[in-house]
C-alpha cells in the first residue's frame, strides 16, 4: 500500500511464527542445529541465530533451508502463513 511504512520484523509475532515453523521442520527431520548447518555448508551459529530470533531468513535462505530439511518449501511457507497475524488480517 502506498505511503504505508513497513514495521521492523525482527522479533515480531510474524517473525516468531517463521522461526517456530523452521524449528518445527528441523525437529521433524530429526536434525540438530549442527547437522542442519553442515547440510547448508554454514556454521552452527547461522542456524542458532535465526532460531533465537537474532537474524532474519531471506527467501533464498528459506528455499535452501527447505531443501536441507527435505521439506517442500511451499508446504513450509503455507504452514508459516496460516500461523501469522499478517496473513489472518488479509483473509
Which sequence ranges carry the predicted segments?
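Key DNA-contact positions within bacterial/archaeal DNA-binding proteins
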Residues: 34, 45, 55, 74
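Short, basic-rich loop-to-helix N-cap that marks the start of a DNA-contacting helix
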Residues: 54-64
Amino acid at each position: 500500500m502506498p505511503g504505508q511504512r513497513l514495521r521492523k520484523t525482527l522479533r515480531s509475532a510474524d517473525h516468531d511464527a517463521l522461526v517456530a515453523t523452521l524449528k518445527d521442520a528441523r525437529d521433524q527431520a530429526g536434525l540438530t542445529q549442527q547437522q542442519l548447518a553442515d547440510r547448508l555448508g554454514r556454521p552452527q551459529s547461522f542456524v542458532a541465530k535465526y532460531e533465537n530470533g537474532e537474524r532474519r531468513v531471506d527467501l533464498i535462505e528459506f528455499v535452501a533451508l527447505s531443501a536441507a530439511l527435505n521439506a517442500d518449501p511451499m508446504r513450509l511457507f503455507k504452514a508459516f502463513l496460516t500461523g501469522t497475524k499478517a496473513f489472518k488480517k488479509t483473509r
